[in-house]
Amino acid sequence: MPAAYDNYDYPSYWDNRDYEHGSEVEAIKTLLENISKVKKVIEIGGGFGRLIPSYSFRVKKIILTDPSAKLLSNARKKYKDSKKIKFLQSTLENVPKVVKQRDFDLAIMVRVLHHIEDIDSAFETIHKLLDKNGYFILEFANKRHVKATIRHFLGGDITYPMEIHPVDIRSKKSVRANTLPFINFHPDQIMQCLQTAGFDIIQTLSVSNIRSSFLKRMFPLKFLLDIEKLLQKPLSGIKFGPSVFVLARKRVN
């Protein structure tokens, strides 16, 4: 059965999104500074390998997983000369059935959680894959980002920032078409679920903080990314941006 992204040109989605991509690369590199040594990484939902260059320089072995045969084929072509990367077509829940558990120093999952409804099960699966003291870099779509909060305030919904339940932002047409869910999460829910699954939170970053078509037209990419780099840590406390990156560590019991 084809995966959802087999019927979608995901690489083209990233055309004209150099700022968003660069912001995510910067976030991963910043979080990696907290980890002294990484040998083996598994990236969940890694697609066509967009983010591999952001961490491959730090690791010896990489397993890139994705449900989409089409995206993995793109990744294989892109990294055909790399001996450190292996490719695995699998959904997250099936990964532990085909790879050794407690075998990875680091798991990375970016732009995946918004398609997952059972996040508790997802975090438990990641926990099983990680070795003792293993790390988890997670990205999630932030329900409470500043633009959404202002929009709800103007609409009279002053309790919006405190409503912890997730929101599926698909259109009615997409819901009727049974497309993948697209869920924005409250940061407090994510932190609570990670801790329940056996993780300690090491650091969070607010990402894509100045995402704006207007700013992209007005300023060069390097300038925007320099500003983004300066903002990711200071704005993490209020979860300002539409995307939040988390570094968590498997708790030692």
Language-model region placement:
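A C-terminal cap/extension of S-adenosyl-L-methionine-dependent methyltransferases
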Residues: I158, I183, P187-Q192, I202-N253
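Class I SAM-dependent methyltransferase SAM/SAH-binding core
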Residues: F48-V95
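Acceptor-substrate binding/catalytic loop of class I
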Residues: F140, S174-Q189
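A short glycine-rich, Lys/Arg-flanked "PGG" loop and its adjoining helix->strand segment in the class I
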Residues: D120-Y135
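Conserved class I S-adenosyl-L-methionine
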Residues: M1-S36, V38-G47, R50-S54, L71-N74, I137-H165, L225-D226
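A conserved beta-strand element that flanks and buttresses the S-adenosyl-L-methionine
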Residues: I108
